[in-house]
């Protein structure tokens, strides 16, 4: 019985140790990705002249047609 309890405790401590290691690795990766994403977001942001408001002030805005709705499929007729 004593050996079984110590092996369970050993397994539990190993599991917790691995969990802590993986959480630290995951934390460092997420901070790294946040640092990488920030400059990209700044570059993607459009300047005010390209926004809808800028186009309205600059001239007539081209009219965009709404997305066409998918045609409803005809229900198969069940003949008897």
Curated annotation (Swiss-Prot):
GO MF annotations for this entry?
LRR domain binding; receptor serine/threonine kinase binding
**What does the entry list under GO cellular component?**
apoplast; endoplasmic reticulum; Golgi apparatus; perinuclear endoplasmic reticulum; plasma membrane; secretory vesicle
Q: Where is the composition biased (Basic residues)?
A: 70-80
Q: In which tissues is it expressed?
A: Mostly expressed in leaves, and, to a lower extent, in roots, stems, siliques, seeds and flowers.
* Keyword Signal set for record: yes
Give me the ranges of the annotated region Disordered: 44-80
First-listed, main subcellular location of the protein, grouped into a coarse class: membrane
Q: Would you indicate the residue range of the signal peptide?
A: 1-27
**Motif SCOOP motif in this chain: where?**
62-80
UniProt KW Secreted keyword: yes
Q: In this entry, which stretches build a coiled coil?
A: none
| UniProt keyword terms in alphabetical order | Apoplast, Cell membrane, Cleavage on pair of basic residues, Endoplasmic reticulum, Golgi apparatus, Membrane, Secreted, Signal
Compartments (UniProt record): Cell membrane; Secreted, Extracellular space, Apoplast; Endoplasmic reticulum; Golgi apparatus
Q: What induces it?
A: Induced by drought, salt stress, ethylene (ET) and salicylic acid (SA), mainly in shoots.
Q: List the disulfide bonds.
A: none
Q: Which GO terms describe its biological process?
A: response to ethylene; response to salicylic acid; response to salt stress; response to water deprivation
Tell me the subunit arrangement: Interacts with MIK2 (via extracellular leucine-rich repeat domain); this interaction triggers the formation of complex between MIK2 and the BAK1/SERK3 and SERK4 coreceptors, and subsequent BAK1 activation by phosphorylation.
What is the role of the protein in this entry? Brassicaceae-specific phytocytokine (plant endogenous peptide released into the apoplast) perceived by MIK2 in a BAK1/SERK3 and SERK4 coreceptors-dependent manner, that modulates various physiological and antimicrobial processes including growth prevention and reactive oxygen species (ROS) response regulation.
User: Which family, according to the similarity comment?
Assistant: Belongs to the serine rich endogenous peptide (SCOOP) phytocytokine family.
What protein does this entry describe? Secreted transmembrane peptide 3
């Amino acid at each position: 019985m004593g050996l079984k309890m110590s092996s369970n405790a050993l397994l539990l401590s190993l599991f917790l140790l691995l969990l802590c290691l993986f959480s630290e690795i995951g934390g460092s990766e997420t901070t790294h990705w946040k640092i990488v994403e920030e400059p990209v977001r700044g570059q993607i942001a459009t300047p005010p002249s390209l926004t809808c408001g800028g186009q309205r002030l600059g001239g007539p805005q081209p009219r965009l047609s709404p997305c066409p709705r998918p045609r409803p499929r005809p229900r198969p007729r069940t003949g008897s």
